[in-house]
Amino acid sequence: MTSKIIVALDYEKEAEALALVDQIDPSLCRLKVGKEMFTTLGINFVKQLHQRNFDVFLDLKYHDIPNTVARAVRSAADLGVWMVDLHASGGLRMMEEAKKILEPYGKDAPLLIAVTVLTSMEDLDLLQIGINASPMEQVLRLAHLTQRAGLDGVVCSPQEVEILRNTCGKEFKLVTPGIRPIGTDFGDQRRVMTPTAAIRAGSDYLVIGRPITQADNPAEVLRSINVSIG
């Protein structure tokens, strides 16, 4: 699997999600399962995606006391997901314990990444929760904390990719939502970029939802994006 595209499955019903999944090629993308779908459909839905040969990014953004998060991450590893995430704002100890609990899994451990600043958040949003910093400043602070904890990478907006690549190195994975091909609606994302521009900036993986899932021909859109990013 070499594709850099992660298709975000944001559906209310299993049948609708699987109808989309059955139209696309697992060699051309991975799939992201978030809070809504996982809460509704649970681990059996993830298993169905695995049976269709898709790698799964379990996007539950864990944020709790260290022991609780570590155990949740272990459960994700037992499920066999490819990637799982947590909130870097949970702190260094929380992230370190989550990383440590994956050690027995060796090469079969999922990638463990941290969410820095949600791509819907702007300066005012941060100020309202007591953070007197720009999104960029907060992303850098949390990315460095994530790297110190030994995690594999972070979720960040495309605009932060270049500086994170320069400061965190080539091996640190950068996963970027807020990806919108030219001509598509921005939706509720505020810090966005096209797939080609994001890859050029240094993104490792692009999270793309509605431009693919709501397309008349999802398979063709997916193929086209893969071609555009090489």
UniProtKB/Swiss-Prot annotation:
What does the record give as the active site? Answer: 61
List the pathway annotation: Pyrimidine metabolism; UMP biosynthesis via de novo pathway; UMP from orotate: step 2/2
InterPro entries, sorted: Aldolase_TIM, OMPdecase, OMPdecase_AS, OMPdecase_bac, OMPdeCOase_dom, RibuloseP-bd_barrel
Top class in the EC scheme: lyase
Keyword match Phosphoprotein? no
Swiss-Prot/TrEMBL catalytic activity = orotidine 5'-phosphate + H(+) = UMP + CO2
Spell out the CDD domains in the cross-references: OMP_decarboxylase_like (cd04725)
The residues that the entry says bind substrate are 10, 32, 59-68, 119, 180, 189, 209-210
Q: Name one GO molecular function term.
A: orotidine-5'-phosphate decarboxylase activity
Identify the keywords attached in UniProt to this record, alphabetized: Decarboxylase, Lyase, Pyrimidine biosynthesis
Q: Name one GO cellular component term.
A: cytosol
Single GO biological process annotation from the record: 'de novo' pyrimidine nucleobase biosynthetic process
According to the UniProt entry, the coiled-coil residues are: none
Give the E.C. number(s): 4.1.1.23
The record's annotation in Gene3D superfamilies points to: Aldolase class I (3.20.20.70)
User: Mind telling me which PANTHER family this protein's record contains?
Assistant: OROTIDINE 5'-PHOSPHATE DECARBOXYLASE (PTHR32119:SF2)
State the family it belongs to.
Answer: Belongs to the OMP decarboxylase family. Type 1 subfamily.
Put simply, this protein is called Orotidine 5'-phosphate decarboxylase
Q: Give the source lineage, highest ranks first.
A: Bacteria, Pseudomonadati, Pseudomonadota, Gammaproteobacteria, Pasteurellales
Q: Gene of origin?
A: pyrF
